[in-house]
Design a protein with these regions (language model features):
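Alpha-helical transmembrane segments of multi-pass membrane proteins predominantly involved
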Residues: 2-498
Length: 498
């Protein structure tokens, strides 16, 4: 029989677990939502599979609300002995994933509605969001590896959702092969870290890396960055991006362009300062060079593109470079992390708005070539306004959210004595104006081809798509107009690890 002391200890442990679980409500809701989505997909008839999407969207919004509640009322703390880090950065990501995931469900509705695997698609999307949330919260190398693998598996299947499409199958295979290679490289790098520290805790790894040979530090960190850089579509880990976006269903491309990317960047922002404290091996300079290469390659490769999805793929690579500027500034500026958080919010809104309009044009005109956008302004002014807001915000036109986001990451770079990076970013921003304006000019100035079908008002079944575009376009404007209070909130995300 257990004695009284043992019972008291067990009771204390139980109470401690319950307290810790209260900080994990966003993860718990997404977990429950994912499991129930699988069950509903199995039991509901084909005509009712749309209910799975409604449930998944509700679970995402619930996770976002609880993330905000924890952020405002409970504070920040390591959970499960530091395996899970509940702090301003991870909770902001959880809220952003919740809202963005729900919007992606709305974008997917007109594409997957009535298909054989509609419920399965929504369940996969939910599991991918759960994995992305855990990736942003990982304070342990084991959880980091598990989240990367789970996220890769779910998004790989989503990319190949259109099994009858050869392009979708090709995109899925390329995504899988590159994901497998990058995952293996990351696992190898993490094994080095474990060998050095004798622990999977990132804090323990950081202490061990401070005493390790510099060559070992550089090599192992580069391997880990291979896996995380693949998620964020950073150069030179970006090669899968244009083919995957172009071959996948457009709602999946929209999802890939936002959620895994931001989760990967947040993981990099968490891992590097913990594992390489005090700018060990000059990691901030290395990340700054990576940011410069990423934005430059993305913008230059986007210039000749006529396929708007591939153009957005290269644009998203360039945007990763701008976002990475916030990470590069972390070690030498308190402005880096708030700038990253604010720009992530702006990027999610404007990129989802852009993909939403492209999806509408594809469904109405059967193409995503620039010529398909000709005459769009006359045929459907609403889509053109949303397209213009999204593309001009991606460029960085004031007072839109993208302008404020870029301004803040530029300030962070200058504050961190990386003015050269800010100059490169400004030059890249000017370059990007050309390809964004090409699409806008086709929609506003060019007449429609005689054989083209005019864009008509979306059918009632497309109401979720219209709502998603309206919300994201409004957020693109609103985040810019209300930039100051939003940035003050973003500054709370400088708290890492409690």
């Amino acid at each position: 029989m257990p004695n009284g002391g043992t019972l008291e200890q067990a009771k204390e442990m139980e109470e401690m677990m319950l307290v810790e679980l209260a900080w994990l409500w966003p993860v718990g809701i997404l977990t429950l939502g994912s499991i129930l989505a699988v069950v509903l997909a199995m039991v509901l008839p084909r005509g009712r599979q749309g209910l799975v999407g409604a449930w998944v969207a509700a679970a995402h919004l619930g996770a976002a609300v609880t993330a905000v509640e924890v952020w405002l009322n409970r504070g920040f703390t390591p959970v499960m002995e530091g395996v899970v880090m509940v702090d301003g950065l991870s909770l902001t990501l959880a809220a952003l994933i919740g809202v963005s995931g729900a919007l992606c469900v709305a974008l997917a509705q007109p594409v997957v509605a009535g298909t054989d695997r509609e419920g399965e698609f929504y369940a996969l999307l939910s599991f991918a969001s759960l994995s992305a949330t855990l990736l942003g919260m990982a304070g342990d190398a084991a959880l980091l590896a598990l989240a990367v693998a789970a996220l890769g598996l779910a998004t790989f299947v989503m990319t190949g959702y259109s099994r009858e499409s050869a392009r979708s199958n090709e995109a899925s295979v390329k995504y899988y092969i590159f994901g497998t290679v990058s995952g293996a490289a990351m696992a190898y790098g993490l094994s080095w870290w474990f060998g050095l520290a004798g622990s999977t805790s990132l804090e323990s790894i950081g202490r061990a890396m401070a005493e390790a040979p510099e060559l070992v530090v550089i090599a192992s960190t580069a391997l880990v960055l291979f896996g995380l850089g693949y998620k964020a579509a950073l150069v030179p880990f970006h090669f899968w991006t244009p083919d995957a976006y172009d071959g996948a269903p457009l709602p999946v491309a929209a999802y890939l362009s936002v959620l895994p990317k931001l989760a990967g960047l947040v993981a990099i922002a968490r891992v590097l300062p913990l594992a390489l404290p005090g700018d060990a091996a000059g990691w901030s300079t290395a990340v700054a060079i990576l940011a410069a290469a990423t934005m430059t390659w993305g913008n230059l490769a986007a210039l000749p593109q006529r396929n708007v999805v591939r153009l957005l793929a290269y644009s998203s690579i360039a945007q990763s470079g701008y976002l990475l500027m916030g990470v590069a500034a972390l070690e030498h500026s308190d402005h880096g992390l708030p700038a990253l958080v604010y720009y992530a919010l702006a990027y999610a809104a404007m990129n989802l708005a852009a993909f939403g309009v492209v999806l509408a044009v594809q469904r109405e005109r059967g193409s995503v070539d620039i010529d398909a956008f000709r005459g769009l302004g006359r045929a459907h002014p609403w889509w053109t306004v949303a397209l213009g807001l999204a593309f001009l915000s991606l460029f960085g036109l004031p007072p839109l959210a993208g302008f404020v986001g870029k301004l803040e990451v530029f300030r962070a770079a200058i504050d961190a004595d990386q003015a050269w990076l800010a100059v490169i970013a400004v030059v890249n921003t000017v370059i990007s104006l050309y390809y964004y304006l090409r699409v806008i000019a086709a929609a506003v100035l060019d007449p429609a081809e005689p054989h083209e079908t005019e864009v008509t008002t979306p059918a009632p079944s497309h109401a979720p798509l219209s709502a998603a575009v309206a919300l994201t376009a409004a957020a693109t404007v609103g985040f810019g107009v209300a930039a100051e209070p939003l940035f003050r909130l973003a500054e709370r995300a400088i708290v890492l690890g409690g």
